[in-house]
Each structure stands twice: as C-alpha cells, then as structure tokens.
Amino acid sequence: LPRPVAYGATVSTPEGIVCIGGNNSDSSLVEVSRISYNPTKGEVAVCALPPLPSPMDNLSAAFTGQEIYVAGGNENGQPCHTFLRLNLANIEKGWEQLPDFPGAARVQPVLAAGESPNGTRIYLAGGFQPILNEEEPIVPTDVLVFDPATFTWQQETVLPPFKDGTNRTLTGGCAVTFQTDKILFMGGVNYDCFLAAIARPIHLAKAEAARDSAAITRLQAEAKAYMHHPVEWYRFNTTLLQYDLSTKAWSDLGEYEQLARAGAGAVIQY
C-alpha cells in the first residue's frame, strides 16, 4: 500500500482487491487503492482509484456489478450517515453521493449486496453511534436496505436475539454474500458488554456531577479493568447467521469459536 493504514474497508473485485479510506497514526485517509496480481509475471501491482470526497475510517464496503458502495464510519473525524458509490466502469466520474442512511450513525458496520426478488439491494447492519452531544450511545439492532433503482432506504428486518432474549449486534463483524440471494453474518462484539463500555464515560460524568462517590469508584474500576478480562468475558459472537433475501428468514448455521472475532475480515471461495 502507499502508506500504513488501518480501519479502512476492502472489497474483492474481478480486477483485484480495493482498499478504501482508513486511518493511521497521523490522520484519516481519502485514498482508494486497487491491489491486483499478475499470475503470468508473478507480480503484485497497486494502483490509485478516485479518492473519497472526505477522509473516512471505520466504514464498510460492498461490491456488486461494477459498483462499489461504502457506508458509515467516521467522516472528517465524526460519526456519519454517509453513503457513496463508485462505478468502476466510469471511474472518471468519481464517487457519487447517495442518500444518507436513516437512524443512528454507524461506526464499524457491515455492508453487503445481494439479489432480492425485486432486484439488487444493499444491506447495512451493525455499527454504533458513540456519545454525541452528551446523549447516550446507540447500538442498532436492525438491518437497513437500500434500493439503487429508487434511491430509497427502509428497514429490512431486525437481528434475531440470542436464545436468552438478549440483543445481538454485528458491530465489528463480517457480512458476505452467498449464492447471490443470501447473506452470511458472523463475528462482532457482544451487545451488552460493548454498550456498557461505550456508555461508561457519560455515566461517569453524570456520577461526578451528582457527586456519587460509589458510582464513580465503580465506573472507574470497570473502565480500568475493561481491557484486562479473560477472552471469554467479552462474549464475541460465535454464531454463523444466514439471511435469505427471498424469504426474509434467518437461519442459525451453528456456533464456531473461530468466528469470535471483532474487526476481522471474511471472504467466500467458490
């Protein structure tokens, strides 16, 4: 890559892997690069594609046809509702601004494209909205869908809760399209553990304002211990979920310890 980068988005295309945005120790990035492999020469090449309109990180991306879609993350350092598209058959046009997705901002969401009975659709799930304007953070549990033909968003469904009734999130998880009309969702953080962590600063501020010494001590201790628990304590998602775009039905395909990751990537090899 042209320079060190993390927390960007990637998609696989017939011409290579496209790496989008991200950040490093200096700043968030607008750069978009395509990595391609020439099997005849045994060489890897990196070429630049049109940059993002603004620096973005912790975003998600999906590819369908000749188009790359990106959604969410941070834009210019702020949680956003941004939704963009790049047509690889007309890259001179650059990135196209599409309608913002509704509801909460989504940092570290997942995005996938698939074929519904009514045509191509783009599905957005997971992510979180951190504390904004002293308001409680939000971890969405719904799945949104975008119709490229009408340029409209709507709620598609909600993530199925766990067997004990607790909420599920795909924040930091993965989504990959399977057989064109199904999406596999996997990994990500635990809803309750993660929401408690990102809400802790605002709860601590309220405790300090109320001079609640017991709450202050407890919240400070929780914050200090958060990154030092045993792996099992974080309860990262191990379930492989399948969503059928034709029937709008969820299927639980089993529990796999290998899926208990946050911030990982996933691909399907046919």
Regions found by a protein language model. Give the residues of each.
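Kelch-like beta-propeller repeat domains
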Residues: L1-Y270
